[in-house]
Amino acid sequence: KVGRHYFRVAQAQDNRRVNPNRIRKSIGAERSFTEDLRTLETMAAALVTIVDEVEARMLKAKKMGYTLTLKIKYADYRQITRSRTVDLPMQQATDMGILAQALLEHHLEPQPRVRLLGVAMANLVPAQLVGYQQLSLL
């Protein structure tokens, strides 16, 4: 019975209703690189661009988040995700960048060849509940 269901789904036959107005559970961005990143410095520079985009999306959505998730995909397509939850919600790229950088440094393999980096914020709350002006957490 389950096998038939998955066969139909694989054939794009799915009659379930689509809800285009679902509540967003996370806001993030990721980048695939044409050449593998091999140094922490190049990865840190890429993270700056990524967290800037996440900040812009969070500002547009008027959200703040408690949990940051870093995604690392290596050249051999192995992938890891690591998360950290903070006590106060954040929205600023500087705070997200510092936290993402710390996760990267802690979990990066020796002699890495990174193909993709991503950052997402989850445990979202409306920004107006905590105020639009976020104080630095660091």
Model regions and ranges:
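DNA-contacting surface of Y-family translesion DNA polymerases
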Residues: 1-114, 124-134, 138
